[in-house]
Curated annotation (Swiss-Prot):
GO terms for molecular function: protein homodimerization activity; spermidine synthase activity. Its EC number is 2.5.1.16. It is an enzyme of class 2 (transferase). It comes from the Eukaryota. S-adenosyl 3-(methylsulfanyl)propylamine binds at Q49, Q80, D104, E124, D155, G156, D173. It holds the Pfam family Spermine_synth. Homodimer or homotetramer. Disulfide bonds: none annotated. This is Spermidine synthase. Belongs to the spermidine/spermine synthase family. The modification N-acetylmethionine is found at M1. Keywords: Acetylation, Polyamine biosynthesis, Spermidine biosynthesis, Transferase. The activity is thought to be regulated mainly by the availability of decarboxylated S-adenosylmethionine.
Length: 302
């Protein structure tokens, strides 16, 4: 393993042993994901979390927060494109967008591609994640240079309390429900987002994995249905997330919203112009087709 620009690679963080990074977590017990490391690029502890970046043998640069992979250059586009386009293409005219989290810049990159979007506010509590991403994940962080962006380094909770009835779409790109991020999976957080949305507003949040967190997803869906007239759940595949999948919880204040049929259908020319690699209108529809065990658990009987 080569030395990196921020110092020698050895001994490196504890998660890297004999040239391999190994991800383990109490949220997915009994399983692990390993990636071969070519070079340790960055390892520091910010005010909020441990930040690690390494160049992998087959997945490009990898961002790890508190020992958990957040994104890799090879497969990040599937998650970023879906969490952004599922809500944006379900809204007839999304002009004002709020992003909570997403310090790597990937969601922002996708949001600003939409011509209808006039302004984006992003709230990221950890400025170090933004700076590290600009340095080591430039293909994701490119959105930070957009003239549509107002960047707020601080607490998204407090920001939304002060900005009610303000946004057409809110996207929460959170880490897993541990530590500070745990509050982003609670009913009180969804209630706060509801007040920050305009009367026909839509939200989309990282919704964990159906293979690992079905009870949590069911709980979230239950309280969301008490807050919003329209609630749905979708998912996509992404190799370096736990069990190779990640889900999305979508809610709308507009009773006529149908998440399963995009109101904005992209032509092939638009897909190519937006440089999309995963999302298209057919993939949008397919994302809501759940396997039988998930459909039953969520009582998703149409």
């Amino acid at each position: 393993m080569e030395p990196g620009p921020d110092g020698p690679a050895a001994p490196g963080p504890a998660a890297i042993r004999e040239g391999w990074f190994r991800e383990t977590c109490s949220l997915w017990p009994g399983q692990a994901l390993s990636l071969q490391v070519e070079q340790l690029l960055h390892h520091r502890r910010s005010r909020y979390q441990d930040i690690l970046v390494f160049r992998s043998k087959t997945y490009g640069n990898v961002l790890v927060l508190d020992g958990v992979i957040q994104c890799t250059e090879r497969d990040e586009f599937s998650y970023q494109e879906m969490i952004a386009n599922l809500p944006l293409c379900s809204h007839p005219n999304p002009r004002k967008v709020l992003i909570i989290g997403g310090g790597d810049g990937g969601v922002l990159r996708e949001v600003v591609k939409h011509p209808s979007v006039e302004s984006v506010v992003q709230c990221e509590i950890d400025e170090d994640v933004i700076e590290v991403s600009k340095k080591f994940l430039p293909g994701m962080a490119v959105g930070f240079s957009s003239s549509k962006l107002t960047l707020h380094v601080g607490d998204g909770f407090e920001f939304m309390k002060q900005n009610q009835d303000a946004f057409d779409v809110i996207i929460t790109d959170s880490s897993d429900p541990m530590g500070p991020a745990e509050s982003l999976f609670k009913e009180s957080y969804y209630q706060l987002m509801k007040t920050a949305l305009k009367e026909d507003g839509i939200l989309c949040c990282q919704g964990e994995c159906q293979w690992l967190h079905l009870d949590l997803i069911k709980e979230m869906r239950h309280f969301c249905k008490s807050l919003f007239p329209v609630v749905d759940y979708a998912y996509c595949s992404i190799p370096t997330y736990p069990s190779g999948q990640i889900g999305f919880m979508l809610c709308s204040k507009n009773p006529s919203t149908n998440f399963r049929e995009p109101v904005q259908q992209l032509t092939q020319a638009q897909v190519e112009q937006m440089q999309l690699k995963y999302y298209n209108s057919d993939m949008h529809r397919a994302a809501f087709v759940l396997p039988e065990f998930t459909r039953k658990a969520l009582n998703d009987i149409s």
